[in-house]
Amino acid sequence: LQVIIKDNSLVLTPSHIKAYMLMTLQGLEYLHQHWILHRDLKPNNLLLDENGVLKLADFGLAKSFGSPNRAYTHQVVTRWYRAPELLFGARMYGVGVDMWAVGCILAELLLRVPFLPGDSDLDQLTRIFETLGTPTEEQWPDMCSLPDFVTFKSFPGIPLQHIFIAAGDDLLDLIQGLFLFNPCTRITATQALKTQYFSNRPGPTPGCQLPRPNCPLETLKEQSNPAVATKRKRTQALEQGKTFIF
């Protein structure tokens, strides 16, 4: 999906975006119903097959959840898609970490650029609060008790309709639910699939009609895995009888 988002020659319609989100949430709902957290959702880990069917991939950080008082590492999820509770060092968390990542992916589909590209954990939190507003204790009661909590300046945030200017009210409601600061009230995959956004028109585009990347398969592999490009260059160098240091 990352390649699709970055390909500016492709037009992503509201129906395309709805299809990608529908398949993402359906896959995530299945995982969560089977007590599994993905913990590394991002566009690069959402793969599309030749029929346009989206698959969740890379389960290297996946973990079962649901055991009472079970602690986990907070160093999960690629930073740009990491929920604020993880950035504050939470060791006990649930499906909310995946749902926050879904919100970041949805925002990236709409904007065609990463939504909150922080340079460090502190910068990531700053970008989140500058964009979405600094949460209060009323909005997120357990925030101050998290291991790595630090106090931030009170940012008012930017209204979502000013960020996603082409989004309708139903889509804005979904985005709002995905970006709730309190993970206990953040929308779940099952709840998201029942929102008006998915029942309202336009409907999702069938997989076979979704846009395809305009670049060759080998180029796609190199974009998603730099090691493939390095291997190709090394092979070409050997074939030409040259010595290269990679």
What are these regions, as identified by a protein language model?
Residues 20-21:
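Activation segment signature within eukaryotic-like protein kinase domains
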Residues 32-48:
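Catalytic-loop of the protein kinase fold
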Residues 86-97, 115-116:
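Conserved end of the kinase activation segment
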Residues 201-246:
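C-terminal intrinsically disordered, low-complexity extensions immediately downstream
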Residues 134-177:
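C-terminal lobe substrate-recognition/regulatory segment of protein kinase catalytic domains
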Residues 172-191:
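A conserved short helix/loop substructure at the end of the activation segment
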Residues 72-86:
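Conserved activation segment of eukaryotic-like protein kinases, specifically the C-terminal portion
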